[in-house]
């Protein structure tokens, strides 16, 4: 979060979520949306506000549906602590995490595991979308980045070229070429934009 605490699966409330909803609707010109969300409170709050704004704007909206696979990466014994606290209390584990981005010592969820579950959730949701719908997936910074990398056909345990998505920011993926959502699992995805937001002072996912 913005306070620098690894909140991961701790259900802290979301903030400034109306902004992302308004920005999403402002750039929208399609035939309907389907919303799928992590079940953590801060994500559900965001998803419901987005759905409400679409409803007020008169656009057809399905969801939000909740999917456990979209939860944030699990940070094991690092949960709920600042980096300073982790470095002081678990120096060996912290050093491993800083060097590798992984930490079996603290039982941090492996990047490839996070990426696969997020990818699977997105693909499953995309397959049931109509061709004229857009899919909005509400998740969390580290999970989003690893899910995107996995959707692009890369290994998130190896490729570290995408940072986590900041609070009230979003990324956009589109099916390759003229593919539909239903065929994107075969033809692949293209990252159209990443970590886009309307306020630079809202950071920290």
Model-derived segments and spans:
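Active-site-proximal alpha-helix that buttresses catalytic centers in soluble enzyme cores
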Residues: 1-59
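Phosphate-handling substructures
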Residues: 4, 8-9, 52-120, 203-205
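Soluble or luminal CAZymes and related metallo-dependent hydrolases
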Residues: 10-17, 110-118, 129, 165
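Generic structural signal for well-ordered alpha-helical scaffold segments
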Residues: 19-26, 51, 115, 119-127, ...
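Short glycine-rich phosphate-binding loop at a beta-alpha junction
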Residues: 30-39, 63-66, 134-138
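A short acidic (Asp/Glu
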Residues: 45-48, 146-150
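Acidic, low-complexity terminal tails and accessory targeting/binding regions
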Residues: 56, 73-85, 127, 131-133, ...
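GST superfamily/GST-like fold recognition
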Residues: 141-145
């Amino acid at each position: 979060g913005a306070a620098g605490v690894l909140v991961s699966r701790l259900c802290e409330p979301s903030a400034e979520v109306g902004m992302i909803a308004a920005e999403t609707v402002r750039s929208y010109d399609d035939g309907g949306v389907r919303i799928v969300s992590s079940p953590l409170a801060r994500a559900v709050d965001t998803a419901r506000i987005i759905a409400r704004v679409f409803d007020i704007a008169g656009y057809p909206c399905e969801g939000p549906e909740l999917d456990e696979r979209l939860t944030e990466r699990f940070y094991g014994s690092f949960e709920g602590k600042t980096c300073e606290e982790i470095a002081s209390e678990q120096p060996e584990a912290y050093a491993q995490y800083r060097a590798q981005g992984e930490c079996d010592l603290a039982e941090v969820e492996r990047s490839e595991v996070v990426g696969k579950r997020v990818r699977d959730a997105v693909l499953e949701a995309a397959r049931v979308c109509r061709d004229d719908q857009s899919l909005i997936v509400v998740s969390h910074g580290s999970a989003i980045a690893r899910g995107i990398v996995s959707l692009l056909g890369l290994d998130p345990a190896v490729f570290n070229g995408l940072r986590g998505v900041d609070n009230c920011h979003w990324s956009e993926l589109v099916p390759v070429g003229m593919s539909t959502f239903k065929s994107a699992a075969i033809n692949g995805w293209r990252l159209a934009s990443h970590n886009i937001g309307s306020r630079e002072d809202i950071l920290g996912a």
